Amino acid sequence: MGVKASQTGFVVLVLLQCCSAYKLVCYYTSWSQYREGDGSCFPDALDRFLCTHIIYSFANISNDHIDTWEWNDVTLYGMLNTLKNRNPNLKTLLSVGGWNFGSQRFSKIASNTQSRRTFIKSVPPFLRTHGFDGLDLAWLYPGRRDKQHFTTLIKEMKAEFIKEAQPGKKQLLLSAALSAGKVTIDSSYDIAKISQHLDFISIMTYDFHGAWRGTTGHHSPLFRGQEDASPDRFSNTDYAVGYMLRLGAPASKLVMGIPTFGRSFTLASSETGVGAPISGPGIPGRFTKEAGTLAYYEICDFLRGATVHRILGQQVPYATKGNQWVGYDDQESVKSKVQYLKDRQLAGAMVWALDLDDFQGSFCGQDLRFPLTNAIKDALAAT
């Protein structure tokens, strides 16, 4: 009786530990392999124990079938999934779509019954062949006419995964990356319906602000700024998460995005605060080479000799040096974000992207690989 009771208690404890654990969903981008020198990142550089889920971005769709994108994707798939040899609890997913894929191609497939069916049927064998545990849908973004088709695609994909798992296989996971912008949420997603069929939802709570605004501003604020104009009251993490929950997304399926990159601007005057006029995006980073975007490891370089400020109400930092301004996340701000998602009882955090963090541990002076992602992991584990 005593032994049985203690065994039962142990089982309950294990279940509680399992089911109360937060997800840490981390994206890896295949094009990071092409960055020069120390910016080049391959899947074998990733920490197999850092994240609960790693999502490989992106797969393509050719002739209505899921397909590789890069010439060496199959090799990189193998590198990634080898990480599970020493951490069998790690889950890997393959993300299909992305910015370069475009919305129109997704729309054409999802709106045609035969094309949609062909695509859906092609997914499980592809994932099984290459060792993935699931699929992530990154349709950026469904148009107003696509809203129902996106719901149907998700519903039918999930049904196929359930059917495919019948012979005793472990069921494939299905997730989606969704915009955090109110206008896109309203036009693109039937949140309550798609939530029923997704294992988790990654809400992209970043890129709220960019050079198109004509002024400086943080791209991933936790809260609304004190001086935000009317439309800007929606452009923050707190509003996006709350709105998703009000629309019917279960907190237990919502994974909150935290960026390991910053958005930069070139200042147009001597003003350097939030809302200062700009002449355009910031100068490209040495490795990422994209105007207006800096990887966290490039930001660590930028911070040498820069002036750092904190936007207290939004709980995020920005830095200025000369005519350059960059809003980013640091270890302090990600801890605030993790505490927020815990208070909201969300499923966990999502990171875009591992290859934009200091993955070598050589840029940020901490002798620590993936310092931002590790800070998120530690905060998730803290009681």
Swiss-Prot record:
InterPro entries recorded: Chitinase_II/V-like_cat (IPR011583), Chitinase_insertion_sf (IPR029070), Glyco_hydro18_cat (IPR001223), Glycoside_hydrolase_SF (IPR017853), Glycosyl_Hydrlase_18 (IPR050314)
Single GO biological process annotation from the record: carbohydrate metabolic process
Disease listed for this protein: Asthma-related traits 7: Asthma-related traits include clinical symptoms of asthma, such as coughing, wheezing, dyspnea, bronchial hyperresponsiveness as assessed by methacholine challenge test, serum IgE levels, atopy and atopic dermatitis.
Induction text: Up-regulated in colon under several inflammatory conditions. Down-regulated by hyperoxia in bronchial epithelial cells.
Organism of provenance: Homo sapiens
Gene Ontology CC annotations of this record: cytoplasm; endoplasmic reticulum; extracellular exosome; extracellular matrix; extracellular region; extracellular space; perinuclear region of cytoplasm; specific granule lumen
Listed transmembrane segments: none
Primary location: secreted
UniProt signal peptide: 1-21
Protein family according to the UniProt entry: Belongs to the glycosyl hydrolase 18 family.
Disulfide bond residue pairs: 26-51, 300-364
Subunit note: Monomer.
Protein name as it appears in the record: Chitinase-3-like protein 1
The record's account of how the chain is modified after translation: Glycosylated.
A Pfam family of this chain: Glyco_hydro_18
Domain of life from the UniProt record: Eukaryota
Function comment: Carbohydrate-binding lectin with a preference for chitin. Has no chitinase activity. May play a role in tissue remodeling and in the capacity of cells to respond to and cope with changes in their environment. Plays a role in T-helper cell type 2 (Th2) inflammatory response and IL-13-induced inflammation, regulating allergen sensitization, inflammatory cell apoptosis, dendritic cell accumulation and M2 macrophage differentiation. Facilitates invasion of pathogenic enteric bacteria into colonic mucosa and lymphoid organs.
Gene Ontology MF, one: carbohydrate binding
Binding of chitin, residues: 70-71, 97-100, 141, 204-207, 263, 352
Region called Important for AKT1 activation and IL8 production, residue ranges: 324-338
Annotated glycan sites: 60
Location of the protein in the cell: Secreted, Extracellular space; Cytoplasm; Cytoplasm, Perinuclear region; Endoplasmic reticulum
Tissue: Present in activated macrophages, articular chondrocytes, synovial cells as well as in liver. Very low or undetectable expression in non-inflammatory colon. Undetectable in muscle tissues, lung, pancreas, mononuclear cells, or fibroblasts.
Keywords: Antimicrobial, Apoptosis, Asthma, Cytoplasm, Disulfide bond, Endoplasmic reticulum, Glycoprotein, Inflammatory response, Lectin, Schizophrenia, Secreted, Signal
Domain GH18: from-to ranges: 22-383
